[in-house]
Amino acid sequence: MGEKILLFIPMFNCEKQITRVLNQINEKVREYITEIIVVDNRSTDNSQEKVIDYIKNKNKNIKLLINTENYNLGGSHKVAFNYAVKNNFDYVIVLHGDDQGNLSDFLPILKEEIYKKYDCCLGARFMKESKLMGYSSIRIWGNYIFNWLFSIVTKEKVYDLGSGLNMYSVKILKNEYYKKFPDTLYFNNCMLLASYYYTHNLLFYPISWKEEDQVSNNKLIKFSISLLKMLKNYKKDSQKYMTSEMREKIIDEYKTDIVM
């Protein structure tokens, strides 16, 4: 396997979880990962200190990047995607820093080189083989409903609107089709719609997902209304919508500093 694979961990106020996330990068996983970057989005807790301490004492092959301003989750993705392109990576794996996803769930994809057949391998929390722990019934059924609605609009089977464990071919990221997408939590939803609009070869893969001590930034009613608006705009004119400026604040360059 000669591909360069980047592991990208977005982080914001994850002091309780980030060490557990970094501990997921065991020997079996490291066999497939070329480089690891943690992109901190101006955390106001001790997240940065936790990562620095981990790098000093346990793993020196991790880089900590700190955004020059809070770009939100979508903006951190743009930082990492740009890093992957500039440094000639072939693939980038996204693992959220809040310890809800399990990186080992993607080991079969890596071992069997399944990822080579696809532009995107998306972790799916709501497939038959998926495992959910501590997830409320209302959120589960809400996701089922929206997966169904997205399936109707895209005319493809959708199993997840955006989990925190995904893998992308850097080849499709080079033209920055995602740059105008929202820097907010809706970034992943736009990435999904874009995959259908640009006819990316896409795989949903069952993963495990847990909620323990994480703090959700997702306000369900507001989020649901925004998703419905997104679907309406996509259905009305997919080309116009997917190429439109969706950001509240236009940023020409998403800058970050490498701390260590």
Regions picked out by a protein language model, each given a short descriptive name:
Residues 14-29:
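Short, well-formed alpha-helical segments that are part of the catalytic scaffolds
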Residues 67-86, 91, 103-185, 212-222, ...:
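Acceptor/aglycone-binding surface of glycosyltransferases and processive sugar-polymer synthases
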Residues 1-2, 155, 179-260:
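Hydrophobic helical membrane-anchoring modules
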Residues 33-43, 65-66:
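Short beta-strand/loop segment that forms part of the nucleotide-sugar
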Residues 4-6, 35, 190:
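Cell-envelope/extracellular polymer assembly enzymes that use nucleotide-activated donors
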Residues 19, 45-54:
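Acidic helix N-cap motif at the loop->helix transition within catalytic regions
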Residues 40-49, 99:
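A conserved acidic beta->alpha catalytic loop
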